[in-house]
């Protein structure tokens, strides 16, 4: 079995660093690179691409809303076509920078509020996925299982890779618990290890209310801004290796 381990990276800008990207890049198999709106800038994007190339890590675009102060986690009521252009602008920027460094963008992962907005609107999801397919039909789209984005990506002929968020709680319906609610963030090392082990062994996760739910995913995400994210990523990687699974970038094992 192949498993991808990924993290959102390059989300600082200028002299500001959100996490130790250099250390994280030595642990993950895929990097979701911020594209300049919620985080990142041209120099940071180029640095992330070079780090990924040096470490044999696959790269993906991680576009968000133009809201640095809110880190792209606040919804802004843009028109659908405006959102489409914002997404394409960011994707195109990373593709150009990657190409100049001899790398290809292999996957795509929405950031926070932009993804939430797309995921609850099937018309918007189709608009976005069709645009991505026109730019590069080989891109792999990170999705939540049974989501609008997953369905739209498949309608557009794009490959998908389902995500398990190791540091976020799920409800009994398989939805992420809103960040503002108690228990939404899972940062305890023992809890993360147990969650990942259950996922790798049984394809399941324990929801916040204790319900055991199916988690049909092949990629594990740890957020770089989660407290202790580096150690959590090391724990997750060790569990993947101990399970006998092969660590592989997203583009190598999408459905």
UniProtKB/Swiss-Prot annotation:
EC number, UniProt record: 3.5.2.9
GO BP terms in the entry: carbohydrate metabolic process
SUPFAM superfamilies: Glycoside hydrolase/deacetylase
Positions of transmembrane segments: none
Source domain of life: Bacteria
Swiss-Prot/TrEMBL catalytic activity: 5-oxo-L-proline + ATP + 2 H2O = L-glutamate + ADP + phosphate + H(+)
The keyword Oxidoreductase is annotated on this UniProt entry: no
A Gene Ontology molecular function term of the record: ATP binding
Gene3D superfamilies associated with the record: Glycoside hydrolase/deacetylase
Keywords: ATP-binding, Hydrolase, Nucleotide-binding
Oligomer status and interactors: Forms a complex composed of PxpA, PxpB and PxpC.
HAMAP family in UniProt: PxpA
Family: Belongs to the LamB/PxpA family.
Function description: Catalyzes the cleavage of 5-oxoproline to form L-glutamate coupled to the hydrolysis of ATP to ADP and inorganic phosphate.
Protein name: 5-oxoprolinase subunit A 2
Organism from which the protein derives: Agrobacterium fabrum (strain C58 / ATCC 33970)
